[in-house]
């Protein structure tokens, strides 16, 4: 049974305002979603926080999120807290997210980690459409469970898909399936004793592979690597035994990117 009477929806559309900074052009949301007004931590980079006024996702919860980042906008989107997926019993919780990043626009999508509780089943599907001049940082951090309770890999199933298109041509696809019933997630080809996993994609970002590699090597408690995709963009995969090392690594990379992206002419 869905916690809410209908599918939870969030719509956000941005544009460049009179002062030359990214502002909200239009928005709409249903419970539990809310949006904070944008603030500007640096130059013309806007930051908007997505809020979910709920204890987490339950069985039957379905979220439909659509984000349209207007041309020339520079925006960072964050979440309010760690996302919890509760025991979904014999069902599942799901999220479909569609993101459009306009010409010469920059989006840094940086949510907090996702924590699947015991017997949680979650399905996530994200599609991102870019123009050739769009810039993107997109990440997800997945936790093995409630680590402090030693509840590791007790969830039912977690399946997330990320599809990125540039001028309608596919340039990146990630299909993550974590199923403790069929796979030993602690084996050396999976988590290998770690409990937190970062997946970060960088498209058209002003940072070299060597710079990202240096960030990883300097990050204490992180085991990770960066690779170049066939379309010459970057993908980072990293493991750690806590959220903080991965959040710090992600922030370090994002800071290097935005130092260039937000420079005013």
From Swiss-Prot:
Null allele outcome, as annotated, is: Cells do not express urease.
Supply the alphabetized keyword list: Chaperone, Cytoplasm, Nickel insertion, Virulence
Which Gene Ontology molecular function entries are recorded, alphabetically?
A: nickel cation binding
**InterPro entries reported for this sequence:** UreD
The beginning of the lineage is:
Bacteria, Pseudomonadati, Campylobacterota, Epsilonproteobacteria, Campylobacterales
Membership in a protein family: Belongs to the UreD family.
Q: Where in the cell is it found?
A: Cytoplasm
Organism of this sequence: Helicobacter pylori (strain ATCC 700392 / 26695)
Q: What is this protein called?
A: Urease accessory protein UreH
- Function of the protein: Required for maturation of urease via the functional incorporation of the urease nickel metallocenter.
Using the UniProt record, give the first listed, main subcellular location: cytoplasm
The record ties this protein, via PANTHER family, to: UREASE ACCESSORY PROTEIN D
Question: How would you summarize the oligomeric state and partners of this protein?
Answer: UreH, UreF and UreG form a complex that acts as a GTP-hydrolysis-dependent molecular chaperone, activating the urease apoprotein by helping to assemble the nickel containing metallocenter of UreC. The UreE protein probably delivers the nickel.
Q: Does the keyword Chaperone apply?
A: yes
An example Gene Ontology CC term for this record: cytoplasm
What is the primary gene name for this protein?
ureH
Q: Pfam families attached here? A: UreD
């Amino acid at each position: 049974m869905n916690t809410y009477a209908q599918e939870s929806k969030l719509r956000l559309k941005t544009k460049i305002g009179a002062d030359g900074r990214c502002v909200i052009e239009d928005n709409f949301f249903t419970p539990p979603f809310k949006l904070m007004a944008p603030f500007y931590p640096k130059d013309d980079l806007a930051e908007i926080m997505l809020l979910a006024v709920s204890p987490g996702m339950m069985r039957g919860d379905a979220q439909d999120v659509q984000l349209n980042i207007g041309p020339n906008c520079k925006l960072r989107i964050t979440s309010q807290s760690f996302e919890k997926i509760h025991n979904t019993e014999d069902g599942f919780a799901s999220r479909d997210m569609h993101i459009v990043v306009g010409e010469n626009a920059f989006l840094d999508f940086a949510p907090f980690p996702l924590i699947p509780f015991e017997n949680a089943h979650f399905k996530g599907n994200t599609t991102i459409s870019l123009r050739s001049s769009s810039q993107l940082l997109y990440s997800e951090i997945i936790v093995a469970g409630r680590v402090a309770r030693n509840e590791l890999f007790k969830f039912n199933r977690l399946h997330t898909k990320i599809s990125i298109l540039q001028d309608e041509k596919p340039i990146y696809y990630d299909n993550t399936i974590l199923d403790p019933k069929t796979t030993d997630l602690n084996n050396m080809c999976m988590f290998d004793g770690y409990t937190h996993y970062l997946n970060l994609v960088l498209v058209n970002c002003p940072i070299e592979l060597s710079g990202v590699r240096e960030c990883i090597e300097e990050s204490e408690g992180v085991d990770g690597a960066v690779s170049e995709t066939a379309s010459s963009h970057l993908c980072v995969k990293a493991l750690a035994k806590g959220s903080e090392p991965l959040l710090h690594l992600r922030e370090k990379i994002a800071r290097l990117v935005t130092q260039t992206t937000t420079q005013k002419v």
